[in-house]
């Protein structure tokens, strides 16, 4: 009985993946590149940040920095999905996804945060997941994540903003009515100042045999679709 209770206390009662010491090194995302989203709650974790949209029970955007030094490939024990303790209204419960037919799709990929246990575990907050078609998640979305990692190894530091396209009338899952996006976007930026370059993708939340480059989109068009203002200080020629 003692062993059983210890297991429950350690696992079932886990309510935070924040650093106990408070000394974890924070990976900074440039403030100038943070998109605007009216009504979202800004949440800043050690290794990514997001704007939580309570009406859709998920992030409107997740932003993170990716450097080739982050791609360590360390083996990490997969933690439980838990609610984000920093979301004041409470992020969606992971059980909303049970029996829904949708994957718990990461926005900031767990595979990009294996360089530390805290970084890896924080990606399992439910504020960082969104309902994704299983073939989409395992297929083209994974291919895009792999491509971004190749770019990070080639070019060094990248800044990524990603999320589902949210809006009225979307289907929902679970008792929290988690919205199911019809498409997901990703914006990748490298360089700073006049050397800044950005590329955008918009991919339907369904299976496809096409490659990510088939879904390139300008930032202007992506802003019109999402209602977000990406990189407000980014030079126009970079977009």
What do the predicted segments below correspond to?
Residues 1-239:
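Domain-level detector for secreted/extracellular nuclease and nuclease-toxin modules, and
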């Amino acid at each position: 009985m003692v062993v059983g209770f210890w297991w429950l206390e350690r696992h079932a009662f886990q309510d935070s993946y924040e650093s106990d010491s408070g000394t974890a090194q924070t990976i900074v995302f440039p403030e100038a590149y943070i998109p605007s989203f009216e009504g979202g709650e800004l949440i800043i974790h050690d290794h990514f940040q997001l704007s939580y949209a309570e009406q859709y029970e998920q992030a409107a955007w997740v932003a993170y920095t990716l450097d080739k030094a982050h791609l360590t490939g360390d083996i990490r024990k997969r933690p439980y999905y838990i609610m984000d303790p920093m979301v004041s209204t409470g992020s969606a419960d992971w059980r909303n996804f049970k029996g829904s037919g949708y994957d718990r799709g990461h926005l900031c990929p767990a595979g990009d945060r294996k360089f530390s246990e805290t970084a890896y575990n924080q990606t399992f907050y439910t504020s960082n997941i969104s309902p994704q078609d299983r073939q989409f998640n395992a297929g083209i979305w994974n291919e895009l994540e792999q491509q971004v990692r190749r770019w990070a190894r080639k070019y060094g530091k990248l800044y990524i903003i990603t999320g589902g396209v949210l809006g009225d009338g979307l289907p929902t899952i679970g008792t929290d009515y988690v919205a199911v996006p019809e498409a997901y976007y990703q914006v990748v930026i490298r360089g700073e100042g006049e050397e800044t370059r950005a590329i955008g993708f918009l991919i339907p939340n369904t299976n496809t045999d096409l490659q990510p480059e088939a879904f390139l989109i300008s930032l202007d068009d992506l802003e019109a679709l999402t209602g977000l203002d990406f990189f407000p200080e980014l030079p126009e020629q970079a977009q």
